[in-house]
Amino acid sequence: MIPMHVAVIMDGNGRWARKQLQERTFGHEQGVSVLESIVDECINCGIRFLTVYAFSTENWSRPPTEVSFLFELLSAAIQRVRTTYRERNVKVQFCGERTTQIPETVIAAMNCIEQDTAACTGLILSVCFNYGGHTEIAQACRSVLADCLEGDAVENIKTRLQMPIEQFIQQIDTHLYANLPPVDLLIRTGCEKRLSNFLPWHLAYAEIIFSDLLWPEFSVRAFKDCLDEFASRTRRFGGVQLSPMTGVYSDTHPHSSTNALSNHD
């Protein structure tokens, strides 16, 4: 079984560079090459969504020279893959806050590749840049409240307070940064075992694999191994299924990653 939505925390660039007796920026350069190879593999094996953690809202605390280099690296990568991804039917979108801290040239490059690939219908590559999961949810809730101010605010608020919780959850979901389905598989490289404020809304039932490889070491073979591990797991989504043949509850579940995709095409 191939996951529909794979998310990746690409951790370990700086540590890998230090192991090579190089500057941290060298690790980031190698990390971009690895990402491009993983994108190619996602296309080859039919994965529908790939979401990657490129720059968090907490990364602003890094040295200014490193942050500036990351901006330059992003712009260069966009220019390099822009035509290729359009030709390969890859839709690219950025998730995060586009604040004035980000150089205008970088914002322009992001907008450009989004526009160029907007009509693509293959792999959807979501790049989380200046992203924080708590901020994403808070901004979505703000947008729901803002919607209430259109017309009779008091009545609109009452309506939302009285609606079924599933419907209210759907309203929040539609105001998130991008129209993404739940994550099926999360991969984090770099030895750490935490989520780092990445996609908390989407990770509720994700299978998680923590890799001891640093991101520049993460090969296509390592990615395939993660897919094999995912395929070997039983996803129960918190429940069990009653077998009509035996009358016994089993650990299998009728839901699969394709069900999560239905409202997000």
UniProtKB/Swiss-Prot annotation:
Gene Ontology biological-process entries: dolichyl diphosphate biosynthetic process
Keywords, ordered alphabetically: Lipid metabolism, Magnesium, Transferase
Keyword Magnesium assigned: yes
UniProt entry tagged with the keyword Lipid metabolism: yes
GO molecular function: ditrans,polycis-polyprenyl diphosphate synthase [(2E,6E)-farnesyl diphosphate specific] activity; ditrans,polycis-undecaprenyl-diphosphate synthase [(2E,6E)-farnesyl-diphosphate specific] activity
UniProt-listed Enzyme Commission number(s): 2.5.1.31
Motif (RXG motif): 236-238
Top EC category: transferase
Pathway(s): Protein modification; protein glycosylation; Lipid metabolism
Required co-factors: Mg(2+)
Coiled-coil stretches: none
Family matches, as Pfam families: Prenyltransf (PF01255)
Record's catalysed reaction(s): 8 isopentenyl diphosphate + (2E,6E)-farnesyl diphosphate = di-trans,octa-cis-undecaprenyl diphosphate + 8 diphosphate
UniProt cross-references to HAMAP family, sorted A to Z: ISPT
Extra facts: The synthetic pathway for dolichol synthesis is conserved in Giardia lamblia, even if some of the important enzymes are different from those of higher eukaryotes or remain unidentified.
Similarity remark: Belongs to the UPP synthase family.
Function: Cis-prenyl transferase involved in the synthesis of dolichol, a long-chain polyprenol that is utilized as a sugar carrier in protein glycosylation in the endoplasmic reticulum (ER). Catalyzes the sequential condensation of isopentenyl pyrophosphate (IPP) with farnesyl pyrophosphate (FPP) to produce a polyprenyl pyrophosphate which contains 11 (major) and 12 (minor) isoprene units.
UniProt protein name: Di-trans,poly-cis-undecaprenyl-diphosphate synthase
Organism: Giardia intestinalis (strain ATCC 50803 / WB clone C6) (Giardia lamblia)
Upper classification of the organism: Eukaryota, Metamonada, Diplomonadida, Hexamitidae, Giardiinae
Gene name linked to the record: UPPS
